Amino acid sequence: MDLVYGLVWLLTVLLEGISGQGVYAPPTVRIVHSGLACNIEEERYSERVYTIREGETLELTCLVTGHPRPQIRWTKTAGSASDRFQDSSVFNETLRITSIQRHQGGRYYCKAENGLGSPAIKSIRVDVYYLDDPVVTVHQSIGEAKEQFYYERTVFLRCVANSNPPVRYSWRRGQEVLLQGSDKGVEIYEPFFTQGETKILKLKNLRPQDYANYSCIASVRNVCNIPDKMVSFRLSNKTASPSIKLLVDDPIVVNPGEAITLVCVTTGGEPMPSLTWVRSFGTLPEKIVLNGGTLTIPAITSDDAGTYSCIANNNVGNPAKKSTNIIVRALKKGRFWITPDPYHKDDNIQIGREVKISCQVEAVPSEELTFSWFKNGRPLRSSERMVITQTDPDVSPGTTNLDIIDLKFTDFGTYTCVASLKGGGISDISIDVNISSSTVPPNLTVPQEKSPLVTREGDTIELQCQVTGKPKPIILWSRADKEVAMPDGTMQMESYDGTLRIVNVSREMSGMYRCQTSQYNGFNVKPREALVQLIVQYPPAVEPAFLEIRQGQDRSVTMSCRVLRAYPIRVLTYEWRLGNKLLRTGQFDSQEYTEYPLKSLSNENYGVYNCSIINEAGAGRCSFLVTGKAYAPEFYYDTYNPVWQNRHRVYSYSLQWTQMNPDAVDRIVAYRLGIRQAGQQRWWEQEIKINGNIQKGELITYNLTELIKPEAYEVRLTPLTKFGEGDSTIRVIKYTGEFHCGFEDGNICLFTQDDTDNFDWTKQSTATRNTKYTPNTGPNADRSGSKEGFYMYIETSRPRLEGEKARLLSPVFSIAPKNPYGPTNSAYCFSFFYHMYGQHIGVLNVYLRLKGQTTIENPLWSSSGNKGQRWNEAHVNIYPITSFQLIFEGIRGPGIEGDIAIDDVSIAEGECAKQDLPTKNSVDGAVGILVHIWLFPVIILISILSPRR
């Protein structure tokens, strides 16, 4: 009966027609690595930790199943410090980081979703290992005097190295290894509140032999092949902390454009200190020139000003630091204001009253600032009626005042304030102020036609306030109705002519704007204000902006366009068009949407329908694409072993897909299949006929033949209906000729445990095995010799009993159907490594199971007994006629020293090399090389029943 079922299944596979089943499934995901990690722990921990050396290439692959094909997204968090996804994401199956750095360690998440069920998420923590060069610093202390002549001198040598994992330190004096307790004058300890980051060597009461060369060795125990690093320090009676001197003044005042040189020299320190320059804020200017302790700034500017510090360090004591402040002369922002007599409630200036003219600039350095006053070009000196003062710098820095007491007609004229710096080199700032009978305070008005001001979104608009008076002050614009920024991002904008120009007006800019006078360049009086209303009209915002409607012929469709917002909201009109053809017009009443129905679709009804909703500002448009195009096919990527190993130079591929929303349009009558070799331009096309209706989730299969090994191909699939072509889907198919499994990956290459056995095979590496493992049995490393590499083994310790079995099942491997009139069946070389060491070794068997046969297992290979502490390799030729599965069976021997292991299982097309095959058919060798012979009648039967291609 099993053989009959097997024949039925095989006939189904051989047919080049169409077959189907529901295959839609939510996503599953797992993360595999490239195998370049120096360690991966996943056995006794709740999380997977992938360890890699800094500078190596990280490569993680997210393997997904599910249909339709899930979308993949890689994200990262910083580890335990943060659970928030970072903004950067990778939308790719493989996450590859070349030359990984320490800050890139953390938890990496792979998220897969296809709209079915919940998204599938898996994570792996990446731990980046590194070891920086160690640094030795020296500190010394001198105790109190004893008996007037003796001083105790103690030296501390501190060794620090940044590392992951924690570093282990060791000390040497010359060639002598220093250990705690080995020398009474030496003490080695870790400071409190540290966790291995540093190790201190304390030399108590220095002795002559303590003056020597000391070495600190930092080690992470060769993890990830990171070598130890060493640093040395020569301790002598001349060892001293650094001291320096700056050969410049403090502060240094210079003019813009000048070159300045700062010189720093060492005056002490052993070993010779190194000198570096830093700036109190920010980085050093890019244009500087450094030469040892000399720093030169060519063509200095105000941006280069600040405090510059020279730091000397020789790792003895504390670094020495000297600083100087560079001041670059500058004069800017000259402005004035007129203050009327404060003892009268009148903002005008009048004969017989006091008037004050104030002048202000920003000066660096402020102590060099001087002012000069002129009237009509002639110098002014302070007198009883003309009082010149300078405001307290703490109250109003950089300000001078000219008080005119008892203003007379002869005082009218032009007053000039000139600001200059004593050091020179900077252009003076000159400010003219006219005092006359026409000098009056400002007044603000808004032209009648300028408020409210109506404009359309996207236009350029000018808001205007008319200012009168002499002199005309600066006008400040701001929002009056809400605390929001102005178009330039500031809270206030300045205008010298009273006009505010706004480019590309948006609807958010509607509202009230305030214009007010500033005290600068005008009268120092209560600000004058005026308001301008801005109304921004914008066309209707509608939904949907675009909607695709797929529907078959003779079916009904209703399109609806809805208004979300508009200004003005009334009166709104609408137009429905198909292309340029006007279908319907109308006006909105109380409803917020308009509809257009199509009762029965035909060829002339397909096309783009536009609904325009219109107001004074413009139109909003809903677009509807009504089409009978079929949706794109959905390629099925979860086919196990889709490559068929046909003949020597060609292969076949089982292409599978489902149809997205097959009932949305007319019945699909065929598919147009296009195929081309990767890198080529020409497509080869053929049609695949479809009989009957396709069901949602139905799996369709078509076998691609005569593909050249090992080329990849691009496949394009287009559904066809009576409407015409639908959307196409393209995928790349690749030849994968050899199966290889080293059991490094999380799901052990889809191997599974047999439910009918007594116990299970176990995945293990030497680095992760139980410390209480049984000695004198089992491997000390994987087949490649790596302590971190994984293999599968049977644990024969108690409670296992003699004769109990553990069975490991391979995934199912597909092969190509064969024709009895063509070449003979393809051969496959099946190979693996096995380890059988221990005095109680039992038996290792390998069986072949063909598709459809659940009870018949054909013995391929067998071995028993102790083979020594080494890995052995086995090769077996197999000639399957249908899909097959391999079974590894380990049988427990008479005692606990009977662990059996396997590693590096491979299946390659073609026979094994003759030198790899056993010389005779013994128990320890191949017992099923010709297992295909008894199946020859089946081949004949199948070949008769199946059509030839």
From Swiss-Prot:
SUPFAM superfamilies: Concanavalin A-like lectins/glucanases (SSF49899), Fibronectin type III (SSF49265), Immunoglobulin (SSF48726). It is found in: Cell membrane. Residues 739-914 form the MAM domain. One of its GO terms (cellular component) is postsynaptic density membrane. Residues 27-127, 134-232, 242-328, 340-436, 442-533, 540-627 form the Ig-like domain. Residues 1-25 form the signal peptide. Residues 925-949 form a propeptide. The keyword ATP-binding does not apply. CDD domains: Ig, MAM. A lipid is attached at D924 (GPI-anchor amidated aspartate). It holds the Pfam family Ig_3. The keyword Signal applies. It comes from the Eukaryota. GO terms for biological process: gene expression; motor behavior; negative regulation of neuron apoptotic process; neuromuscular process; neuron migration; pattern specification process; regulation of presynapse assembly; regulation of synapse maturation. Keywords: Cell membrane, Disulfide bond, Glycoprotein, GPI-anchor, Immunoglobulin domain, Lipoprotein, Membrane, Repeat, Signal. May be involved in cell-cell interactions. PANTHER family: CONTACTIN 5, MAM DOMAIN-CONTAINING GLYCOSYLPHOSPHATIDYLINOSITOL ANCHOR 2. This is MAM domain-containing glycosylphosphatidylinositol anchor protein 2. It comes from Rattus norvegicus (Rat). The lineage of its organism: Eukaryota, Metazoa, Chordata, Craniata, Vertebrata.
